[in-house]
Curated annotation (Swiss-Prot):
Domain bHLH: 327-376
Stretches the record annotates as Disordered: 290-331
Any GO molecular function: transcription cis-regulatory region binding
Location(s) in or outside the cell: Nucleus
Superkingdom to which the source organism belongs: Eukaryota
Main subcellular location of this protein, as a coarse class: nucleus
Name of the featured protein: Transcription factor MTB3
Organism (species): Solanum lycopersicum
Gene assigned in the entry: MTB3
Pfam families: bHLH-MYC_N, HLH
Cited PANTHER family: MYC (PTHR11514), TRANSCRIPTION FACTOR BHLH3 (PTHR11514:SF53)
Length: 517
């Protein structure tokens, strides 16, 4: 299959012109790794066609796709095309309205050629070649038909698999955010002018809805999709399949909306049980993708997926039962699968706690997580530094030296503290810079409970104004100057404790406090 999709020269240019470089790269990877060969689904009607048609018709939705869970022989799981329905597009919708008729015909032929190329590369037959039976192909139809050959493995990040693994719906009504979640289909979605994208997880798959209109989030619609889209079990093959609204068995084609119940043919046929579409959700916590400004946010989905049924389907080794009831890997492939699933679960958990995610791939997620952790570490260092500064200030405030000296008729209390810890330290430093000596200093208590520290200084007339400005800037308190005497009132809100000392001569009131600087 890889050799069939080898492109060169003009073929590659035409493919990239219609699909975009990311989609071409995806199909090259899928073909080289035989993805559609490894993951196959049961043929026939899944029983969701009528429900998908009901959701799209009579509403603003353009298409609906059901991605079903499939498993490979190696035990890997992926979401592959299950069924779909697309509304019939009007002429010119999703295309340039001013293009000439000849240009539209040339573009239409190029689109049909690209679709036929994809169909042939992935093992399709001429009988079910949809593009060959169409008269014209719109951009919406190109997007829809190309999606048939897409696959979303659980070990690679993608919006459909992320919605299924987290059991939460994704609703996007922002054009930029929609293109981000379309990922490799973003070029096709941009040409089709889709503005709304929704992923709704179910028990056995994911329903994708798209619209060319901006549709606000509606929880009732999500619940309706969960209850109406029910997969038949087991699926029964359908005799006459309608593809793109036309009967493939006979030539009598009639126009109508696109209703595809089709699985691309592959070179190898793998058989799986039809009831093996249930995979344990990788994460159960709430998760936000992007921010609320771009229209994207996750919602509660079906949280419980049946792990017990999965465990019953796992093959077991014969012989002695493992100790403590622990399940052992059957072989290296099974061990590798379990390791990948565990790694993916941790990536989903990491994505849930990182607030800003630039892209959906693992490398970008790790880069965003590293940047987020580095920012948190810087914040911690700043907070620790502020905490130390606050602690140092508190220590300085409590370091006081109190000396009591008794005299004959009174007593003197001397309270000493470091200069930097004193409220008037800036004022005193300003005095020292200007070589000003305080002639008198006293402390008094006002009726309002304010402690007033007053200084009487003497300075020359011209220097008084300069000193006044610097003292105002240093202490941020009012300064009043009268003749050559400046009185600085420093209001310090504090409590004045009056102590009484019992001695032989009687009680003495401590009325004077002298600060030692």
């Amino acid at each position: 299959m890889a050799e069939k999709f080898f492109l060169k020269g003009e073929d590659k240019v035409n493919m990239e012109g219609v699909l975009g470089s990311e989609a071409v790269e995806f199909f090259s990877w899928s073909a080289s790794n035989h993805m559609l060969t490894e993951f196959t689904s049961s043929r026939g009607d899944l029983g969701v066609q009528q429900a998908l048609c009901k959701i799209v018709e009579g509403s603003d939705w353009t298409y609906a796709i059901y991605w079903q869970v499939a498993k490979s022989k190696s035990g890997k799981s992926a979401l592959i095309w299950g069924d779909g329905h697309c509304r019939e597009t009007k002429i010119g919708q999703g295309e340039g309205a001013n293009d000439s008729a000849h240009q539209k015909m040339m573009d239409g032929n190029k689109k049909k050629m690209v679709l036929q190329k994809i169909h042939t590369c992935f093992g399709g037959s001429e009988d079910d070649n949809i593009a060959a039976k169409l008269e014209s192909v719109s951009d919406v139809e190109v997007f829809y038909l190309t999606s048939m050959y897409y696959i979303f493995p659980f070990d690679k990040p993608s919006s459909p698999s992320q919605s299924f693994n987290s059991a939460r719906s994704i609703w996007g009504s922002d054009l930029k955010g929609c293109l981000e979640h379309f990922q490799s289909r973003s070029y096709l979605a941009k040409l089709a002018r889709f503005e709304t994208l929704v992923f709704v997880p179910l028990k056995s798959g994911v329903v994708e809805l798209g619209s060319v209109k901006s549709i606000p989030e509606d929880q009732n619609l999500i619940q309706m999709v969960k209850t109406s889209v029910v997969v038949s079990n087991p699926p029964q093959p359908k005799a006459n399949t309608k593809i793109f609204g036309r009967e493939l068995s006979l030539g009598g084609a009639k126009s109508g909306p696109i209703s595809i119940n089709f699985s691309p043919k592959v070179e190898e046929e793998l058989s799986f049980a039809s009831d093996s579409y249930e995979v344990q959700a990788a994460l159960g916590s709430s998760q936000v993708y992007g921010n609320s400004s771009n229209g994207y946010r996750s919602d509660e989905g079906e949280g419980k997926l049946y792990k017990e049924e999965l465990d019953e389907r796992k093959p077991r080794k014969r012989g002695r039962k493992p100790a403590n009831g622990r399940e052992e890997a059957l072989n290296h492939v099974e061990a590798e699968r379990q390791r990948r699933e565990k790694l993916n679960q941790r990536f989903y958990a990491l994505r849930a706690v990182v607030p800003n995610i630039s892209k959906m791939d693992k490398a970008s997620l790790l880069g965003d997580a590293i940047a987020y952790i580095t920012d948190l570490q810087a914040r911690i260092r700043v907070l620790d530094a502020e905490k130390e500064m606050v602690g140092d200030k508190q220590k300085q405030q409590v370091i006081l030296e109190i000396d009591f000296h008794q005299r004959q008729d009174d007593a003197v209390v001397r309270v000493g503290c470091p200069l930097n810890a004193h409220p008037v330290s800036r004022v005193l430093k300003t005095f020292q810079e200007h070589q000003v000596v305080a002639q008198e200093s006293n402390v008094s208590l006002t009726e309002n409970g304010e402690l007033v520290h007053m200084f009487s200084i003497r300075a020359p007339g011209p220097a008084a104004e300069d000193l006044k400005e610097k003292l105002t800037a240093a202490s941020r308190f009012a300064l009043k100057t009268r003749w050559s005497v400046s009185v600085i009132r420093l209001l310090c809100f504090a409590r004045l404790f009056v102590y009484e000392h019992q001695c032989l001569a009687g009680k003495f009131a401590l009325y004077f406090v002298d600060y030692t600087i």
